[in-house]
Amino acid sequence: MNCRVVVEAAVPVYDVASADEAVRIAISKTGEMLNPDLNYVEINMGDRHCPHCGETLEPAFLAADESLVALELEMTVFNVERDEHAARIARKEIGQRLENIPLDVLEIEEIPEESDETTEDESSSAESEADADDPPSDQSADESDDVLPEFEELIDE
């Protein structure tokens, strides 16, 4: 079974003036810590909501030129037995590179394995049907398609 795991990270950012700047720096900082080892981890801004009214808040909390930014880190974990196993693997892999940054698993979604195979089969059958529908063309048309535009003038002469 393959799973898509979304982990929330609370990234501290220092000496910032605005929430937008804090988010940009947090994404950059997290990307530097994860790459090149985990370049398959997707980094997104986190969604925060007010616990009382449900209003959407910015992903960065800013106070005294310091910020705490909520980021969502998404990765796919392959060949796992259970959802909990996928969550542990994702937390371990990401947590090893993001030292002293708290992580919380937000979502675990099982990825259906059959959809990849059927998509490939459908696309290959669609290509073969398109090839069958094309009428046979002249040999001269094939030759002109193979020639680069820079050399067409030389052939015409």
Curated annotation (Swiss-Prot):
UniProt cross-references to NCBIfam families, sorted A to Z: PRK03922.1
Acidic residues: bias regions: 106-157
Cited PANTHER family: UPF0212 PROTEIN MJ0068, UPF0212 PROTEIN TK1194
Similarity field: Belongs to the UPF0212 family.
HAMAP family: UPF0212 (MF_01223)
Region of interest (Disordered), residue spans: 105-157
The protein's name: UPF0212 protein rrnAC1165
InterPro entries: UPF0212
TM spans (from-to): none
One Pfam family, short name: DUF555
